[in-house]
Design a protein with these regions (language model features):
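Binding-site signature for planar aromatic cofactors or substrates
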Residues: 1-188
Length: 188
């Protein structure tokens, strides 16, 4: 059954690298706020060390993860085996958002894939790793990645993406600020 570790082991990193899908969960401090759970793919995440992961975060209609990280930093990642031996792997930690133009952008961007529509990088320091059986996770065949988001971003172009982010990504659904919103406020 489940085991707990204080770092990402080599076998955990290898398992993570094989998964075409992961989930990231965050929540605001307000008990009435909305918990967020987002599926992510596109081979966007990398294990950077035994206690750090990062992923490229694409432009989307919401920016809940970033707002929650700005408020409290709490983050959980989950990876599931949909084929092969059953396994669920969770990474618990504290995350932050890095925007293009931030001092440490290049240090992280150079270690991650370049994807059209990238709006920010999410970096997390991991302090707990937990495995569980995964016996109830169904078998599923991976077909291929969806290209829709990359195609949309390429068609829209960077200037239009910036405008879109300023319209859609500055506040959470619970009206929390995001780093994009804070940066925009400092500019104006």
């Amino acid at each position: 059954m489940g085991k707990v570790f204080d770092h990402i082991r080599e076998e955990d990193a290898a398992f993570i690298a094989r998964q075409p899908l992961f989930f990231v969960a965050t929540a605001p401090l307000d008990a009435d706020g909305h918990v967020n759970l987002s599926p992510k793919g596109m081979d966007a995440l990398r294990v950077l060390s035994a206690d750090e992961v990062a992923y490229v975060d694409m432009t989307g209609s919401g920016n809940e993860t970033s707002a929650h990280l700005l408020e409290n930093g709490r983050v959980t990642f989950m990876f599931c085996a949909f084929n092969g031996a059953p396994n669920i792997l969770r990474l618990f930690g504290t995350g932050r958002t890095i925007l293009p133009g931030d001092a440490d952008w290049s240090a992280y961007a150079d270690r991650l894939p370049t994807l059209p529509g990238t709006r920010q990088i999410i970096v997390a320091s991991i302090d707990r790793v937990q495995t569980s059986c995964g016996f109830a996770v169904p078998y599923m065949d991976y077909v291929k990645p969806r290209e829709t988001l990359c195609d949309w971003a390429e068609k829209k172009g960077e200037d239009a993406l910036v405008t879109y982010r300023h319209e859609k990504n500055v506040r959470s659904i619970d009206d929390l600020p995001t780093p994009i919103g804070e940066a925009l406020a400092q500019e104006g």
